[in-house]
Amino acid sequence: MRRPKKYESGEATQYISRRAALRKLQLSLNDFRRLCILKGVYPREPKHRRRAQKGSSEIKVLYHTKDIRFLLHESIVWTLRDYKIFAKKSNRDRAIKDFRNLKRRLALFPEIKLDHIVKERYPTFIDALKDLDDCLTLLFLFSTFPSLHLIPREQSNLCRRLTIEFLHYVIASKSLRKVFISIKGYYFQAEIKGQKVTWIVPHYYPFKPQSRQEVDFKVMSIFVEFYTIMLGFTNFRLFHGLNLAYPPQFPSSVLQDSEESLKDEASFVSDRIAALNFELLRTDKVQEDEEELDIDMELLEQDGDSKRIIKMKQEAQEVSRLRTLFKGLKFFINREVPREPLVILIRSFGGKVSWDSSIFAGSTYDEGDETITHQIVDRPSITTQYISRDYIQPQWVFDCVNQRQLLPTNKYFIGETLPPHLSPFVDSKRDSYIPPEEKALLDPSLIETHAQSDDDSEDEAQEEEETVDQELLDAQLQLAYQQETAEYKKYGGPDGVNEDEEDPDDEDDNEDDDEEEEELDEKTKRLQEEKQKMSVQSGKVHKVNKRQVHKAEVDEHRLQARMVKPRHRNLFRKLIREKQTKEKEEWLLRKKRRTIEANEKEARKTAKREARKEAAAAAAKASKLGK
């Protein structure tokens, strides 16, 4: 029997170094990286590095041996080898100035086909939707780039086209659920086929070239190469699920015989598609209504799942109301406001939107239209204003979507200090610090109704002043009443007779009252004796000692810490440290909040004091002038 040698089995055979993988695949490092990105193969961290590296203590990049064997049978490997052959032959033709042969070779440039890799990595459509977050974020980022050294113009244009198509699907399906504005950009979350897809759209700033190569655009462009194929398949499937024509097309009513459409119909259509302001052509002639979440009412009769199904029904009703949140409202976007994010929001929830035709193609009505209900402005003042519309800041649209209702517009008028813009991606039931502004937004009873305006706030201020005056008047009346009663007791009643001197008629009445009370006491005693057998004694209030309860919890926690297994102690300590840091952060936030509130209170007091001093000085000055 042969004695087994060391490192011939176990963890040593499960991993392979990157250098050995390059020798096995006969590829360069750049081609190997490209192949790993396209196939979704990434380095692994072994449990025991020394065993995996066959006794070597050097830090190496390791891969699973099974993954490298999997790459051996990939057809892309042959295409990458063809790239090397093509480069050598084209350089030779260029050196000998054989341009005819070079032109022929360029026409036969080898192309990588990634269709089979997409099907291989995502066997089902739901798997592709689950991995759509990073895909959309990266493609939206590359769609804003100009032509760079490693990013050709065709790639950025393709990213722009695919992302616009996806936004058209979101608008047509009304699947948008949450939005948020941050420093990074605009966060969007849509619910597609039961899967929550979240992506970021960057802010629209002018491109600033890098002074140093801090970002490897070559690696990122390889990811984009794969994600464009993936998103193309996804858009095709999503569009056909809604009976929309793919690629996107317009009905004949939009393509009227105008000068622009007759000159260049392709550019006319592409501009209108990028505007996101027109409905797309459907494959069926009759336009289908909006998809509604139908719930079988018979399921509510089941006793076991009644609570869960009722909760599902409530959520479905909220979503159906959210889909028509802006229905019947007409918006106009000023030129200083970002157009595309607001168009996505307003159209996804049933509203109509337009802008100045000089900004971008696709506007449907101008600023002078009197049926406009809201005009979105992001400047301190505006010259001409219409009485029939509300002039609001862009945050109102985002907050309405997150709160799933139309908020009052008085807090979002031009020049107003905006309320805090809270993230909808934070769990409201979390065990951490929640600011009072967020509590006020989460509690429906604290949110003002949509019909409230500045007139209501003025009425409230007048009511507060009246209540203050009424309180002062009540205090003066109470003081006068106390003085009057004191004098009444001191000097006697209205006839000059002291209250301590009693009338004989009153004594007879008191005796009759005593007899009636004795009879009632006897009746109550008899009833108590009859019900004595069935009597229920009242319970006593048990006072809880908070210090003892806290001590018992601490002792129990220490006992649990002792009972933790030795192999789990590091994990237990890590969890305890995370909990302590979380509690410390919460305590610091509460302390900071108390400090801010104390400073604000002190500032209000000083302002009131100064106002009183100014009023007193003005009154004294007026009295001097009167004299």
UniProtKB/Swiss-Prot annotation:
Residues that the record marks as modified (Phosphoserine) are 453, 457
Chief subcellular location: nucleus
Q: Among its keywords, does the record have Nucleus?
A: yes
* Superkingdom as given in the UniProt entry: Eukaryota
Record GO biological process:
maturation of 5.8S rRNA from tricistronic rRNA transcript (SSU-rRNA, 5.8S rRNA, LSU-rRNA); maturation of LSU-rRNA from tricistronic rRNA transcript (SSU-rRNA, 5.8S rRNA, LSU-rRNA)
Gene Ontology cellular-component terms listed: nucleolus; nucleoplasm; PeBoW complex; preribosome, large subunit precursor
- Compartmental location: Nucleus, Nucleolus; Nucleus, Nucleoplasm
The role this protein plays is: Required for maturation of ribosomal RNAs and formation of the large ribosomal subunit.
Protein name as it appears in the record: Pescadillo homolog
Which organism is this protein's natural source? Drosophila melanogaster (Fruit fly)
